[in-house]
Structure formats: structure tokens, C-alpha cells
Amino acid sequence: MSEKKKVLMLHGFVQSDKIFSAKTGGLRKNLKKLGYDLYYPCAPHSIDKKALFQSESEKGRDAAKEFNTSATSDEVYGWFFRNPESFNSFQIDQKVFNYLRNYVLENGPFDGVIGFSQGAGLGGYLVTDFNRILNLTDEQQPALKFFISFSGFKLEDQSYQKEYHRIIQVPSLHVRGELDEVVAESRIMALYESWPDNKRTLLVHPGAHFVPNSKPFVSQVCNWIQGITSKEGQEHNAQPEVDRKQFDKPQLEDDLLDMIDSLGKL
């Protein structure tokens, strides 16, 4: 029996490993058929949801709906916190990198990285030079085969910019929702444009800030992974095509899941 392939799954802000696992059920089931096991680490920073929106201008905002998280669970986490006085100013605590290093050593090595929102932003940064940033050897973690970003963005703080100047070798799929009001299109495209032309693919779905679970969409993602990891794809160093036409209209399954997500019913 061939060894199981593994994917590192990085959840979004105000989520957790369990919440992200529940919200990627369709993707997980289909990737399992392709021989992949998905691993969900949980960010080390606990978040008080009640303290998120305290100012007068923020009152009435719904954390569960805005961050595509659970309305019932108070056990939610984040990978880093922004400076309240400057959106583009933040530092990722070294314990985050230490935690992920140990997680890779204990559960890896991994074939790919998939992230959502803040987790995709962190994942995109890590993938610029995964082993150097996490202090891993090539024996501990061989070269990653792919990276998928759902609503991910380029880290804005100046201290992280030099990493994006590298020629990133990991093939990437960048997914954004046309109705996403949490992460602006310009921020998603900034991460996308950090990759060389022959190492990046853009996929747009008609939904908002969530990971779609419709069968046509999941099939496209799985087909992309199969194409990028196939012997032919690796030899020709080319990105497989994705069919945008399948997503011109919202899928009923996605709409229902999004409504359920807003109710916090995982």
C-alpha cells in the first residue's frame, strides 16, 4: 500500500481546527479519495469574540458571519493580531512558527498547504521559503508540491516583504469569492501576483468569504491538484487549466452551506 499523502490545513481568524475541518468537509472527502489525509493544527492565540467589536462604529457586526466561523463556540483562535491603530502593522509571534515546526515534525511531512483567510495569508508567507522559515531540513520536510489559498492575502507588515521577492517555486491556486467583503480583491491579488506566471492559477467563485463545498467547485480544485502533482505536470512545469464557466451561477449547495454557517450549525 502506498504511503498516505498529507495536506497541512491552516484555519482562518476567529476559527479553530475543528471549525475549519467542519467547513471543508466536501473538500476533505474528495481529497481522501485521491489518497490525501488533511491535518488541522489550531492556532495558539485564543480570541475573545465579545471583545472583537467594541467601538460604536463596529456594534452590530456579526463575528460568526463575517469570519465564517461558529456562532456557538467560544473556543476560537488566530495566528496573529493586528495593531488596532494600524491595520498593516503586526508581528507574528515566534511561538507560532515554533508550534508549526513541531507540528510538521510530529505529523508530516506534507505534500501541500491549504489555508483560509488569515491562515492562507500565513500559509502564503510560509511557502515563500517553508523550510528556512520553520527551520526544517529537506529530510524533515521535502519540497512542497502545492499551495491553495482561499481568500488569502499578502502579509502587509514591512518586516515580511523581503520574502515575497523570492522566486516562489511551489505551484499555487488562489481562490476568491466575488461577494467577499472581508478580504478585498486587491489584497488577494497582491498574494497571487507574488508568484511567477507559470506557478499561479486564479479561480473565482460567485460566493462570499467561505470555502465552497459544491461538487463542481471541489472537482475543479481536485483536478488542479491532480494536474499539478502528476508526473507530466511536474515535467512540463505548467499550471493546469481551471474551467471558470462552471461557476458563473451560485451553486445551491454553497448557498445552503453559507446560510448554515451563519447560524453556526456545524
UniProtKB/Swiss-Prot annotation:
Pfam families recorded: FSH1
SUPFAM superfamilies: alpha/beta-Hydrolases
GO molecular function, one term: hydrolase activity
Domain of life where this protein originates: Eukaryota
Active-site residues annotated for this sequence: S117, D180, H209
Any one Gene Ontology cellular component term annotated for this protein: nucleus
Up-regulation conditions: Regulated by RFX1/CRT1.
InterPro entries: AB_hydrolase_fold, FSH-like_dom, LovG
Keywords: Hydrolase, Serine esterase
Record keyword Hydrolase present: yes
Entry EC no(s): 3.1.-.-
Keyword Hydrolase found: yes
Role description: Serine hydrolase of unknown specificity.
Family: Belongs to the AB hydrolase 3 family.
Protein name as catalogued: Family of serine hydrolases 3
Organism: Saccharomyces cerevisiae (strain ATCC 204508 / S288c) (Baker's yeast)
Species classification: Eukaryota, Fungi, Dikarya, Ascomycota, Saccharomycotina
Gene: FSH3
